[in-house]
């Protein structure tokens, strides 16, 4: 049961830092490349979730890198 709950949490939280840094105003902090990873590392109050989210944010940010190059810094 615990494994199922953890699996669901990881799936729902995957790439959370990437989504937050791109969509919520003020959370990008001027980062253009890998804003989700930088958001996770910077000052996340959810340190235990950051450990789970960081690899997913890294993959998600890498997939969105071509878009980030043309978009410019996220504010």
Swiss-Prot record:
It holds the Pfam family DUF1375. One of its GO terms (biological process) is DNA damage response. Keywords: Signal. It comes from the Bacteria. Residues 1-21 form the signal peptide. The keyword Lipid biosynthesis does not apply. InterPro entries: DUF1375 (IPR010780). To E.coli YidQ. This is Uncharacterized protein YceK. The gene is yceK.
């Amino acid at each position: 049961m615990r494994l199922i709950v953890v699996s669901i949490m990881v799936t729902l939280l995957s790439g959370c830092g990437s989504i937050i840094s791109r969509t919520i105003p003020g959370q990008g902090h001027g980062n253009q490349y890998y804003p989700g990873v930088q958001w996770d590392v910077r000052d996340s109050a959810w340190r235990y979730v950051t450990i789970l989210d960081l690899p997913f944010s890294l993959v998600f940010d890498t997939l969105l890198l071509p878009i980030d190059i043309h978009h410019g810094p996220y504010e």
